[in-house]
Amino acid sequence: MEQDKTLGEEIRQEEQQEQDIPAVTFDEFEIPSYEEWKEAVVALLKGKPFEKSMFTKTYEGITLNPIYRMEDLEGLTHNKTYPGMESNLRGANASGYIYKPWTIAQECDAKTPSEANEMVKYELLKGSTAASVVLDTATRKGYDVDTANKEEIADIGVSLSTLSDVNKLLDDVDLEKFEIDIYAGASNIALLSAVAVVCEQKKLSLKKLHGAITADPIGELALDGKLTRPLDEYYDEMAHSICWAEKFAPELKTVVVNTDVYHNGGANDIQEVAYAMNEAVTYMKSMERRGIDVNTFFFFFRFHFSIGANFFMEIATLRIVRLI
């Protein structure tokens, strides 16, 4: 008891000492002007040019200042926006991620349907909120294993050829609870059909199926330089996928502009955004010619942007996309 009392007194004394320490402030220091700061920096550079040493030119040709001041915000209007405002710069809903939390989608790139299924269930158990599966090149091109190039089978992800494969992939995965996230390549018709049949067999409601089973034919064309069929046929299938989703699976996205091919091909952020917007407009106009209005198209559409190591530029890219 005596030891406990002594220990308690020591703790109280330490807490009192912490309370007695005054808060650290910088009131004793005068705030330097920009000119004073620059003068100090020039002295430290020891003859090196200030503009060359302190300003950074990005891959996009944008010059970044060494520090930013309130004067740099003059004339800007988008910095006064909030979530839910008309620009959508900081999100379409005022409550942001509280309204809809960020989706956690750890990609599963196992080679067989059974292995991919185990990986998906493991990731969902760890906290993922989406069943995110990577398909191999053969499946993305629409080839079965018996006709595909051997090098493209199970090269970067799972190979799917039959309804049985899709059944194994989604076995014991609650698609009413978790999102599904699969990029199907140039066409998603075959995969959408298989998933719809699996849901029917498992007595799962397609109305509750949410997430994305998407196609990006122009992206695949940019990646390989060719498609297995005319581009207009893929546009027809894209229109069919939107009409089907609108009627049967209204919470499922079916069209994507995937910028991986441009980002990994060396495009800077400005070029990546330009290609993405051009591609999105092309899809939109193609769907309009097939009787799908703009609002319906964009309801079933999403962007997929690659994110590199330059945090400043990547955040700027995502913000400018929202503005556009």
What residue spans do the PLM features occupy?
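Acidic/polar, glycine-rich intrinsically disordered N-terminal extensions of enzymes
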Residues: 1-176, 200
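Helix-rich catalytic cores of soluble enzyme domains
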Residues: 177-324
